[in-house]
């Protein structure tokens, strides 16, 4: 099957001819698409020029930044960065001890000198350019198949990245859009000195905890502040006391006036992943197998952490971040399963595919071009699911530390034998600072007792797989026979954790430069397993890449058919989220979660009082409760609700990765921080529903209220530019 591509202009045309009224509030749009939407956006409430949102080096887009997994924004001329509390979680935990628990008590630096280094590997990424490179990635590769095609694409991407990063100080990446139909090279300034400036107490920043997670009404102060630092000449640099605050080209003003019900809002950020063009087979497997299995595994790992690490202990502090992440997606998967069961999603996907097939067969040229696409794609999907049980269990072993660390280090030793451009992504010279940071982070995220318990659980599950699904090298490494001898396994693990030296940072860093021969001679038990598993790992990876190469040939054909079909149907087309910069538009609006109930778009300070029990996670600081009782609203009062708004709902189309995204009004002033979605909208990753799709934002007025009246963060309030009109 011939590999095809279309240019950005053709994709743009695919939705341009659709009536703009169909766009509603759905869509995560690429910045270059926005000028064509100018009239509709103006009618919705956008007051700035839509063209300016497409120019990444100008306000407001150059004030919006990525943290590598979360979004954030500059809010002062001195590199002050605001994001979610849960996005700064790792840095808060990194600087916490049982004696000085910043997660519990909060933290405020009163001077620049008091600002704390963020967790190792923390970065601020400022997107400066997005360039379409489809031809440079895929031209001349039609004759290649499978692994050869995958490797050729990868090499072309590496060459583009190397050229992009040649000037230093930048991190570049090639992103695939529409399943490989388009490729874009994204260039980002990489700021490496990031410091924690302020986070409210956990009883504000994580108020409601896992109980309120994904729920409405919500009363969470999910905000924290970083600062970006650079060398005195303005270039990115590693942490140094001589570094100075970065001066961004622009920053966002923070609105103290906020928004009201019905107001226009937009969000800019880096949404992680959506699946709105996946096939019926993929939907069925994900909802009827992957989500239920993943939910159960995550809940079991949570139990292990809670059973093994006593609350308040140093071990527990180290695992709070992982615990929060596991809980977050366990609840996410629960919602996915629940609302899939209530929805006609599978039938709708099957119907869409039948309509697509009928449309293709109505035209000889279409049939010649796309006739086999869906059946070939479905065949690859079935093939990719053949070892799903084993792959899931082995994949969840990544939540342990020692075994994955040993395997990464030995892989590095092997990759170091190759020329840099031939090495696997993640093991090139450009990746070594990140690699080292990963080794450094382990110290504050690892406890042997917890790691051992999680690995024991995963090996137990692995041992219950059918014999044909087992991996001989893995069985041999852990002395697993036809049946599992748990007593023997316990003895093996006890010995491994007692005798490894990979729990020492200096040892891990030293292994980064050692030879393959030194690894083979090592007596460290985890390194011995990494060496024993290596050939099997590489053979498995080669098969996976060959299959991925086949997908990379077929998926673009499928997406081209979908785009052409949607164009004929008068439907807009936007790419699934892929962690690249996007813009979404919507309004402040409540919703009806179920028959007979109407959720208002704002929550109030008084809702905190009503929820508070004095016990975690509903244990607001006593001073905060007293301020609320006194109706100390100050400058942040909203007459329509007779209080200070805490959180608000919007129709913005967002997903994971948007956390920390600035929610802006029509003048591009910050009116909130996006931090969650309602429980009913989690399934929106697979399809937008205007009736229930709601994002949850921290209201800027609540953030400012906490800063001014509770935490006395006057230095930061004076530094930011607040707008009261």
Segments from the language model and where they lie:
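Bacterial N-terminal signal peptides
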Residues: 9-19
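Positively charged n-region of N-terminal signal peptides that target proteins for export
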Residues: 1-8
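Terminal presequence/propeptide segments associated with secretion/organelle targeting
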Residues: 20-725
């Amino acid at each position: 099957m011939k590999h095809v591509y279309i240019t950005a202009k053709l994709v743009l045309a695919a939705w341009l001819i659709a009536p703009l009224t169909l766009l509603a509030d759905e869509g995560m749009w690429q910045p270059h698409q926005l000028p064509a939407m100018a009239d509709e956006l103006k009618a919705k409430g956008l007051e700035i020029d839509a063209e300016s949102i497409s120019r990444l080096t100008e306000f407001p887009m150059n004030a919006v930044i990525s943290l590598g997994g979360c979004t954030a924004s500059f809010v002062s001329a001195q590199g002050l960065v605001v994001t979610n509390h849960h996005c700064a979680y790792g840095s808060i935990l990194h600087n916490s001890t049982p004696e000085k628990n910043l997660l519990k008590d909060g933290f405020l630096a009163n001077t620049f000198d008091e600002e704390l280094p963020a967790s190792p590997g923390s970065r601020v990424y400022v997107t400066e350019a997005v360039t379409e490179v489809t031809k440079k990635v895929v031209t001349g590769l039609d004759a290649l198949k499978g692994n050869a095609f995958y490797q050729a694409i990868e090499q072309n991407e590496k060459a583009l990245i190397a050229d992009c990063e040649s000037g230093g100080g930048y991190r570049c990446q090639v992103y695939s859009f529409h399943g490989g139909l388009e490729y874009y090279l994204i260039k980002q300034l990489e700021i490496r000195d990031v410091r924690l400036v302020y986070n409210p107490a956990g009883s504000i920043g994580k108020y409601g905890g896992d109980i309120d997670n994904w729920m409405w009404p919500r009363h969470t102060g999910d905000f924290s502040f970083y600062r970006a630092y650079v060398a005195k000449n303005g270039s990115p640099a590693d942490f140094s006391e001589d570094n100075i605050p970065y001066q961004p080209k622009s920053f966002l003003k923070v609105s103290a006036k906020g928004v009201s019900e019905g107001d226009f809002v937009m969000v800019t950020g880096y949404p992680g992943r959506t699946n709105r063009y996946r096939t019926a087979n993929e939907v069925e497997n994900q909802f009827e197998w992957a989500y239920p299995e993943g939910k159960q595994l995550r809940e079991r790992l949570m139990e292990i952490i809670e059973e093994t690490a006593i609350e308040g202990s140093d071990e527990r502090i180290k695992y709070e971040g992982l615990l929060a992440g596991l809980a977050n997606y366990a609840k996410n998967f629960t919602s996915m399963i629940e609302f899939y069961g209530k929805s006609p999603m599978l039938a709708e996907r099957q119907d869409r595919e039948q309509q697509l097939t009928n449309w293709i067969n109505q035209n000889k040229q279409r049939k010649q071009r796309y006739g086999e696409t869906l059946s070939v794609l479905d065949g690859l999907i079935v093939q990719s699911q053949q070892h799903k049980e084993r792959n899931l269990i082995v994949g969840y072993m990544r939540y342990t530390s020692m075994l994955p660390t040993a395997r990464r280090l030995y892989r590095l030793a092997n990759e170091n034998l190759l020329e840099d451009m031939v090495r696997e992504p993640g093991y090139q010279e450009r990746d070594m600072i990140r690699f080292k940071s990963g080794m450094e982070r382990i110290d504050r995220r690892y406890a042997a007792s917890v790691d051992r318990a999680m690995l024991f659980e995963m090996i137990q599950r692995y041992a219950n797989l059918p014999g044909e699904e087992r991996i001989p090298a893995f069985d041999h490494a852990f002395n697993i026979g036809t049946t599992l001898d748990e007593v023997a396994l316990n003895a093996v693990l006890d010995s491994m954790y007692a005798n490894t030296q990979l729990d020492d940072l200096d040892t891990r860093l030293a292994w980064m430069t050692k030879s393959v021969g030194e690894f083979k001679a090592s007596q460290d038990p985890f390194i011995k397993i990494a060496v024993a598993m290596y050939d099997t790992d590489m053979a498995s990876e080669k098969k996976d890449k060959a299959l991925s190469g086949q997908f990379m040939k077929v998926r673009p054909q499928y997406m081209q058919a979908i785009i052409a079909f949607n164009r004929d149907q008068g439907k807009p087309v936007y790419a699934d989220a892929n962690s690249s910069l996007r813009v979404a538009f919507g309004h402040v609006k409540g919703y009806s979660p179920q028959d007979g109930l109407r959720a208002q778009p704002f929550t109030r300070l008084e809702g905190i009082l009503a929820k508070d029990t004095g016990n975690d996670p509903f244990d607001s600081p006593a001073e905060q409760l007293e301020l609320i009782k006194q109706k100390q609203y100050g400058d942040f009062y909203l007459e329509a609700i007779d209080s200070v708004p805490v959180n608000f709902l919007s129709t913005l189309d967002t997903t994971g990765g948007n956390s920390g995204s600035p929610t802006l009004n029509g003048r591009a002033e910050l009116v909130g921080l996006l931090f969650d979605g309602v429980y009913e909208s989690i399934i929106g990753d697979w399809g937008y529903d205007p009736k229930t799709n709601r994002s949850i934002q921290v209201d800027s007025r609540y953030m400012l209220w906490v800063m001014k009246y509770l935490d006395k963060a006057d230095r930061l309030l004076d530094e930011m530019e607040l707008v009261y009109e």
